[in-house]
Design a protein with these regions (language model features):
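Catalytic binding pocket for nucleotide-activated donors in carbohydrate/polymer assembly enzymes
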Residues: 315-432
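Secretory-pathway glycan-assembly enzymes, especially type II membrane glycosyltransferases
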Residues: 56-317
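Short aromatic/hydrophobic-glycine micro-motifs
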Residues: 36, 291, 346-347
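N-terminal, immediately post-signal peptide pro-regions of secreted/luminal proteins
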Residues: 20-59
Length: 434
């Protein structure tokens, strides 16, 4: 952990001493999605990640996944330390179930009564002792578009993912949530009413703490939900595209003419003009100098007549490429696809998030992105914009680092390692009973 420890010391020092506030056609098509759609619901260096080391548990010392740590990991051709720091929160979520007795009957009942929201799957070692494994549907929804790629990927890589399981392992059961929203509110979520005011899609879910039933989901509100996180569908789409082509073309950041922070997108998410997170955020910024924001398509029951002044024409890919700063705002849950498209465009990501996902926690504020507080949008947005304009050189470094970080994430070695560590921790933590 030496690399990230040194980087952490540098990060703390720099924070204390700094005065700053905290193939082309395919690219054109995908970048256009920033303004035409809502969420997906509709690094070149090689590293030598250890595939044999057991996943690490919580420790008192958790280095931060800083830009310096990432760059040093790439230079040293070993990203294990950065991997551990980047995914610390997501993997530590699994440890919350340490010592749980998990009823297989309860898991099957939850899946069966979920109305298609949840499927129960089993990771099973072959009966014949060939050292191979299977990923099999047990109950509930067996097929759903949002998790289809996830299940396909697990089946294709199951032996790599399961290679660190104990010698006597036979089977383990996984509740897989097909929906964007989490399904398992924790016992310590005492402020859900406040969270709902920030984002109406925040809910309790269909699994209660008393069920003692871990749920694997694509998104959650940290501190409120117990869901364990797995990759969202757009990740696999970008992973396939990454394998087919090299880096996508984009105009140099410093040559982009527009310093406004831009957003175009649908009204994805619950709520009306005052409660829908996107509408609420844009209402605060629509007349603010330095922001070029607008809604494009009213969906999910939202009426354009509720806030006609928020609607603007969509932007094409070439329009987005003129901006140095692009905004990401949660949709039904975390805005999965947009964060990857922003990275692909090599713009600075300015995010307004209530939810998180399996990678978002590792994307540190002011290291790889900038963050607007969803509870105080206007004041926070003004502060972020001042920070960006006060140090454009740093902003460019942040944009470039986030682009390289995302390319590092879009690799089989990374997602297989994450799933291997998460599955191994899960099997170690829980005991399945009849």
């Amino acid at each position: 952990m030496r690399v990230c420890f040194v980087s952490l010391c540098f990060y703390i020092f720099s924070r204390k001493t700094s005065s700053k506030v905290s193939s082309r056609d395919a690219f054109e098509k995908r970048l256009s999605e920033l303004g035409n759609r809502g969420d997906a619901r509709e690094a070149d260096d090689e590293d030598n990640l250890s595939h044999s080391a057991a996943p690490k548990r919580k420790s008192a010392h958790n280095p931060a996944p800083t830009r310096a740590c990432f760059e040093e990991s790439m230079r040293s051709n070993s990203s294990t330390d950065f991997f551990d720091a980047f995914f610390h929160k997501a993997l530590a979520d699994v440890d919350e179930f340490q010592g749980f007795n998990v009823s297989k009957a309860t898991l099957a009942s939850i899946a069966s009564r979920s109305g298609g929201k949840i499927g129960l799957y089993a990771l099973q070692k072959h009966a014949i002792d060939d050292g191979k494994f299977g990923w099999n549907h047990v109950a509930g929804a067996s097929e759903f578009w949002s998790t289809r790629d996830f299940h396909t990927y697990i089946r294709e890589h199951v032996n790599e993912i399961a290679k660190n399981l104990p010698e006597d392992f036979k089977e383990a059961y996984f509740l897989i949530n097909n929906y964007d929203e989490p399904q398992s509110m924790g016992v310590h979520c005492v402020d859900i009413d406040r969270l709902r005011k920030l984002h109406p899609n925040v809910g309790e879910g269909i699994v209660s703490p008393g069920d003692q039933a871990p749920v694997w989901s694509m998104s959650k509100v940290r501190g409120c939900h117990m869901d364990i996180l797995f990759p969202f569908p757009d990740y696999f789409s970008h992973l396939r595209e990454r394998k087919r082509s090299r880096d996508t073309p984009a105009s140099p950041w410093s040559e982009r003419p527009n310093d406004d922070i831009a957003f175009r997108g649908s009204t994805t998410g619950f709520g009306d003009a005052t409660s829908n997170l996107r509408a609420r955020a844009l209402s605060a910024l629509i007349d603010e100098p330095g922001f070029d924001v607008g809604l494009t398509v009213p969906i999910q029951g939202f009426q354009k007549s509720w806030a006609p002044h928020l609607f603007k024409n969509t932007m094409k890919a070439e329009d987005f490429r003129k901006f140095k700063f692009l905004m990401d705002i949660d949709g039904n849950a975390h805005s999965f696809n947009r964060q990857l498209l922003i990275a692909q465009s090599k713009a600075v990501m300015v995010r307004v998030n209530v939810f998180t996902d399996w990678i978002a926690d590792g994307v540190m504020d002011e290291e790889f992105c900038y963050t607007i507080d969803p509870s105080d949008v206007l004041r926070s947005a003004r502060a972020v914009r001042r920070t960006l304009l006060d140090d454009l050189e740093r902003a460019e470094h942040v944009a470039n680092a986030y682009h390289r970080l995302t390319r590092w994430l879009l690799r089989d070695e990374i997602v297989v390692r994450y799933l291997r560590d998460a599955f191994t921790r899960y099997v170690s933590s829980v005991r399945f009973v009849e």
